[in-house]
């Protein structure tokens, strides 16, 4: 069975995710380590572009930060569809902690960014994001 994650927002809303640990094992392991250590607690979705993506995971809150290391891309057959969870990066093999949830299919990102999960419930909460929406926590089990 795939790993599951829950993003609990500051307002109590939950976004439940299925993680693709068979297709992106190192990316999922990194996300799990960061999540369960509390790295994401209190971090905002700093980049919200309706019709494109909601991006979070930057400890600086502006898209410039990360965990202090980089991970390799794990390109796989999963596509960027509505609700896809993927790693943000500034070039190949430069991911770390920043991730995004796609609002709509983004075929131009397929084969470029690692898709490592999908929203299974709570996408309506992501649809309500307006920017600077704060995560209380992310936990992976």
Predicted feature descriptions by range:
Residues 1-141:
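Cyclophilin-like peptidyl-prolyl cis-trans isomerases
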């Amino acid at each position: 069975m795939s790993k599951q994650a829950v993003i609990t927002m500051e307002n109590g809303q939950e976004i439940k995710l299925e993680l693709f640990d068979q297709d992106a094992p190192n990316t999922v392991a990194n996300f799990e380590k960061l999540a369960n250590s509390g790295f994401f607690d209190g971090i905002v979705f700093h980049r919200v572009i309706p019709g494109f993506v909601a991006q979070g995971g930057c400890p600086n809150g502006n898209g410039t930060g990360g965990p202090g290391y980089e991970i390799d891309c794990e390109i796989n057959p999963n596509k960027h569809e509505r609700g896809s969870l993927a790693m943000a990066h500034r070039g190949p093999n430069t991911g770390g902690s920043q991730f995004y949830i796609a609002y709509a299919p983004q075929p131009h990102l397929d084969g470029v960014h690692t898709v490592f999960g999908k929203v299974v419930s709570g996408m309506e909460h992501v649809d309500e994001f307006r920017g600077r929406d704060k995560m209380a926590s992310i936990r992976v089990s």
